[in-house]
Design a protein with these regions (language model features):
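Conserved helicase motor
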Residues: 61, 82-88
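Helicase C-terminal subdomain and adjacent C-terminal extension
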Residues: 234-238, 244, 262, 268-302
């Protein structure tokens, strides 16, 4: 893990092929269904030990939807944080929670008042989401609000100090930091939301071009002629105009791999996309100095 950390950091700091060497675990699957199935098998293997926690970290929330559906089908408990910070339900939750927090309290955080706040937020859930497929946003945010109120008991100082802690957290939309205290062994979230958090194991799926990196890098990269594309792979060639975009994407990858305490697992598939074209592996997998090592869950997770 240390060598991988240094290699990715070197690419983030120096816009050129690295002289460092590192390896990463990568499973190459045949299609989307096989990739999702493999990820679920890994999750099941990891959580068979109650002391383990695992996060599936995606570049964009939509990339985790099929994994969430399979977890639901399998009856595997997980915390769903695939929502975006600009989702209307996400923003509405904060508006309602902050308003009801102020209504229920008078400058002091007393647990009786905090429970009244929770009931008031629950009563207004119809304002926060209208579509059934967005209910998970309310449920997840509500759970984080409950945890915030519980964790506020540990804040040193008076009830006013606890009030200010809660008010600051809600005012700065900081509930995601409460994910550190959730009970679920499995977390499904974006890399962006995972900043500052850690899990024993991290799975990073969908390491494809136009997924990770996103189209915001891949489209201009093609226009700039900064990639060598094969049938199912892409290699980055460091055109000067792509420097900013590349550094942003490699920095996101760095955040993802450094969320793991024990190990990080990558997956990719080169099946057909929705236009019936073969998907390419990400250029981030084809960096000079990075060795890709195949793996099976049972040989690593004991």
């Amino acid at each position: 893990m240390k060598a991988l950390d240094l290699l990715i950091r070197d690419y983030a700091e120096n816009y050129k092929p690295s002289s460092l060497k590192a390896s990463v675990l990568l499973k190459h699957l045949s299609n989307d269904a096989e990739e999702d199935k493999f990820i679920i098998q890994g999750i099941e293997q990891i959580v068979s030990n109650r002391d383990n926690k695992v996060a599936v970290l995606v570049r964009a929330g939509w990339q985790g939807n099929s994994i969430a559906e399979m977890l639901d089908q399998k009856g595997i408990q997980y915390f769903n944080a695939l929502f975006r910070e600009n989702d209307s339900e996400y923003l509405s939750f904060y508006n309602v929670a902050l308003e009801e927090f102020h209504n229920a309290t008078s400058g002091k955080a007393v647990q009786r008042d905090l429970q009244r706040c929770l009931r008031a937020v629950e009563a207004r859930k119809g304002e926060i989401y209208q579509r059934d497929d967005k209910k998970y946003i309310f449920d997840s945010m509500y759970k984080l609000l409950e945890i915030l109120f519980i964790e506020s008991r540990k804040v040193d100082g008076t009830s006013k100090d606890k009030y200010e802690y809660i008010d600051f957290t809600l005012g700065n939309k900081g509930l995601k930091h409460m994910m550190e205290f959730i009970d679920e062994q499995v977390v499904l979230t974006t890399i962006h939301a995972a900043k500052g958090l850690e899990w024993e194991y991290v799975i990073i799926p969908k390491l494809n071009g136009f997924a990770f990196p996103s189209s915001y890098m891949c489209n201009p990269c093609q226009d700039a002629g900064s990639c060598n594309r094969g049938l199912d792979y892409c290699e980055f060639t460091y055109a000067e105009e792509m420097k900013k975009a590349f550094k942003e994407e490699i920095s996101i990858l760095y955040v993802a791999i450094t969320r793991a305490k024990k190990d990080v697992f990558l997956t990719v598939n080169t099946g057909l996309n929705r236009w019936n074209h073969m998907k390419t592996t990400s250029c981030l997998l084809n960096l000079e100095g990075l060795a890709l090592v195949d793996y099976e869950w049972k040989s690593i997770i004991k």
